[in-house]
């Protein structure tokens, strides 16, 4: 099981002090960090990390603002094949009834935790970089996101729908992680949000209370 954490410098304190120790405590061994030190933006940094994947295995991609469930590593090892989405956000328009094995167009769009075959990651990066998004986009949203340098999740979802529409992917319920940007100072992308982007299916609420206490004690 390989894990890649997508991070920005502002969140490295959480990644190093809390997230990686939590993963290692569950037995995770191969953990990498892709730190966007140059602040290229989430799309450019994500595609660069995708292009750099090697081999024919797969990698679990985590954002730097997630809390893994108490049996995260065990469940990931059981699901360590193909494309797997481990997070569903109640406010991102994901189909809440589409869990288990679904065709790629019904994959959850949320990108906080997703397993991607390394060959698919490389293919996605090449596809995104090769498209002329102002003229060839399959949707009106993508050219805007391209100009803003955002929307890594949306581009990957579009990649699956366009290039691998008949692939069967896994939407995991209960979710494998909870999104806790609100606990870490808010979204580094938007800097505002009128709702909490929380997991729809999350069973380990006590872990959030414990983490909140540890972060408070750190200050």
Roles of regions detected by a PLM:
Residues 1-62, 66-219:
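Peripheral/terminal regions associated with large enzymatic or DNA-binding modules
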């Amino acid at each position: 099981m390989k894990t890649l954490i997508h991070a920005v410098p502002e969140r490295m304190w959480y990644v190093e002090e809390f997230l990686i120790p939590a993963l290692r405590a569950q037995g995770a061994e191969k953990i990498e960090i892709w730190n966007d030190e140059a602040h290229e933006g989430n799309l450019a940094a994500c595609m660069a990390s995708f292009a750099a994947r090697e081999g024919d295995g797969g990698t679990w991609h985590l954002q730097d603002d997630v809390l893994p469930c108490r049996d995260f590593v065990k469940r990931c090892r059981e699901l360590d094949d193909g494309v797997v989405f481990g997070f569903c956000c109640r406010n991102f328009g994901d189909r809440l009834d589409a869990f288990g094995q679904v065709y790629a167009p019904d994959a959850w769009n949320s990108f906080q935790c997703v397993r991607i075959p390394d060959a698919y990651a490389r293919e996605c990066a090449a596809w995104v970089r090769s498209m002329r998004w102002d003229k060839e986009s399959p949707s009106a949203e993508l050219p805007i996101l391209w100009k803003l340098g955002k929307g890594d999740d949306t581009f990957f979802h579009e990649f699956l729908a366009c290039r691998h529409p008949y692939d069967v992917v896994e939407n995991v319920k209960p979710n494998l992680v909870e999104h806790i940007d609100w606990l870490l100072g808010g979204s580094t992308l938007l800097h505002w949000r009128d709702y909490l982007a929380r997991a729809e299916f999350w069973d380990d609420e006590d872990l959030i209370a414990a983490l909140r206490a540890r972060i408070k004690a750190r200050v």
